[in-house]
């Protein structure tokens, strides 16, 4: 029997999302075999959906489906990346995506309702919280999509051009994550905020300089900010000598919209202090 070390318990905890003591017991039962412990924990089915409903699900997968004139981009979350790689989770995501695409759903609410029974069954089987988080459907003359692994997805709608161009621009979106379509969408508040940040970060460099020099420095930073934040003004990742907007224009196309999803984006993940948890468990055991 392999020794049940703290490192082994920590690894099992990170891979399954279960509590420290549950992981320790599972390892003891499995004779220190972490893979067997995982299989036993999944097979036990003792962890119910209700128990896991409050747990933060910030891992998971992005999925996308397109037919060239429409697309659905979907995010489904799990507690651990381990589950996101399992067939049961992948099947749930695939079935959810197919339903959303076939029914032309435009938001997640009806999909969440119709898939609730399947979600609860998955949670009961795998012992993790699972959530359908968000969904976007787009339509247009030309629609392209790109999926990077199962963690980042992007869709682009064009007027004119072809699917290959739309897909290439979607790949650029996935790589660069622009904030705006073009600089006209950038609000005065956003520009003012960028200006203030620049002034704070460069206070020492600016001190004592003539007003016109400072103004030129600010304008240079704002110009750079607009280029970095705007899709049409970004350098195309596959050919940095060409801006994305120019690429589309040369192909007789206009970029209408883009959507970017990244797994767990905006979800606050709990920060685990493993040493503190061990100390708390030991203290509780002594009482």
Curated annotation (Swiss-Prot):
GO terms for molecular function: translation elongation factor activity. It comes from the Bacteria. GO terms for cellular component: cytoplasm. Keywords: Cytoplasm, Elongation factor, Protein biosynthesis. Residues 80-83 are annotated as: Involved in Mg(2+) ion dislocation from EF-Tu. Associates with the EF-Tu.GDP complex and induces the exchange of GDP to GTP. It remains bound to the aminoacyl-tRNA.EF-Tu.GTP complex up to the GTP hydrolysis stage on the ribosome. Belongs to the EF-Ts family. This is Elongation factor Ts. It comes from Pseudomonas putida (strain ATCC 700007 / DSM 6899 / JCM 31910 / BCRC 17059 / LMG 24140 / F1). The lineage of its organism: Bacteria, Pseudomonadati, Pseudomonadota, Gammaproteobacteria, Pseudomonadales. The gene is tsf.
């Amino acid at each position: 029997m392999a020794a049940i070390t703290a490192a082994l318990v920590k690894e099992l905890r990170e891979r399954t999302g279960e509590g420290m003591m549950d992981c320790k017991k599972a390892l003891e039962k499995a004779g220190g075999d972490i893979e067997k412990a995982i299989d036993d924990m999944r097979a036990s089915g003792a962890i119910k959906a209700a128990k896991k409903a409050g747990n933060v699900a910030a891992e998971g997968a992005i999925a996308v489906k397109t037919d060239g004139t429409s697309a659905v981009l979907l995010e489904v979350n799990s507690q651990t990346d381990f589950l996101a790689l399992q067939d049961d989770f992948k099947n749930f995501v695939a079935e959810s995506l197919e339903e959303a695409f076939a029914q032309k759903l435009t938001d997640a609410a009806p999909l969440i309702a119709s898939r609730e029974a399947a979600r609860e069954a998955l949670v009961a089987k795998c012992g993790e919280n699972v959530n359908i988080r968000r969904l976007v459907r787009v339509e247009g003359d030309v629609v392209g999509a790109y999926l990077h692994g199962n963690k980042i997805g992007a869709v682009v709608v064009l007027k004119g051009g072809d699917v290959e161009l739309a897909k290439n621009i979607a790949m650029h979106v996935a790589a660069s994550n622009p904030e705006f379509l073009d600089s006209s969408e950038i609000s005065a508040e956003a520009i003012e905020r960028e200006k203030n940040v620049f002034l704070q970060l460069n206070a020492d460099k600016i001190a004592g300089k003539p007003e016109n020099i400072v103004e030129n420095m600010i304008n240079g930073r704002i110009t750079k900010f607009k280029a970095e934040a705007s899709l049409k003004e970004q350098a195309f990742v596959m050919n940095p000598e060409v801006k994305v907007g120019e690429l589309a224009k040369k192909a007789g196309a206009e970029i209408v919209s883009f959507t970017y999803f990244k797994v767990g984006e905006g979800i606050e993940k709990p920060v685990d202090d493993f040493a503190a948890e061990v100390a708390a468990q030991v203290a509780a055991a002594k009482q």
